[in-house]
Amino acid sequence: MHHDLKLFTKYFQSVVDGKIRSQVRYNDRNYHIGDTITLHEGQPGLRGFEYTGRTISARISYIDDFGLNAGYVNLSITDIGLLIIDKD
């Protein structure tokens, strides 16, 4: 399965650079190992979440909920893929 997720600008470049290899997310999407995610960079703005046009894809390699609040999971990501910049 594929998931499209928002990611704040302050974290996005660290994912691109390989410094961040996990995401803590609310598990409202029933994530599974092997699922793919596309992270869409942006920031909250006056008209909702404002996207920059940069996206990057990855694969979920491990899921754990140890030590997290109920309903949250830590998604380990790998196979960080293509960075797309779309200014439109």
What residue ranges belong to the model's regions?
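Catalytic phosphate/metal-binding cores of nucleic-acid and nucleotide-processing enzymes, i.e., regions
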Residues: M1-D88
